[in-house]
């Protein structure tokens, strides 16, 4: 079991934390993060992963396009992602080109904020920022 999601140490009611000896369970196992990056070419790479309960998550490894919606008109269009401007989650992600929820991206339609979780949903959905939406 590589990544483990449970607490390894348990705090008893009136004392310090000590190791909690319990059998590891399969449902407590985790996976390394996906780190969805911007694809240099127009080809995209996705990987299905079995989730708990037999369902599947689609993990996007490399993406080139985003579904960008305009809040003023309510229409959504497919746009090419040009670059990642900033990522509030972690400064290093923008430098490495990793797309996460909340990241600000430059698209062919303008600057937008990512609203989906590409590492778990397999698609990049974004909403145009207000200053860009007024110019169009």
From Swiss-Prot:
PROSITE patterns given in the database record: RIBOSOMAL_S8E (PS01193)
Transferase is among the record's keywords: no
GO biological process: translation
Protein name from the UniProt record: Small ribosomal subunit protein eS8
PANTHER family: 40S RIBOSOMAL PROTEIN S8 (PTHR10394)
Subunit structure: Part of the 30S ribosomal subunit.
Taxonomy of the source species: Archaea, Thermoproteota, Thermoprotei, Desulfurococcales, Desulfurococcaceae
UniProt xrefs under Pfam families: Ribosomal_S8e (PF01201)
Gene3D superfamilies: 2.40.10.310
Similarity field: Belongs to the eukaryotic ribosomal protein eS8 family.
Annotated GO CC locations: ribonucleoprotein complex; ribosome
Alphabetic keyword roster: Ribonucleoprotein, Ribosomal protein
InterPro entries: Ribosomal_eS8, Ribosomal_eS8_CS, Ribosomal_protein_eS8_arc, Ribosomal_Se8/biogenesis_NSA2
GO molecular function, one term: structural constituent of ribosome
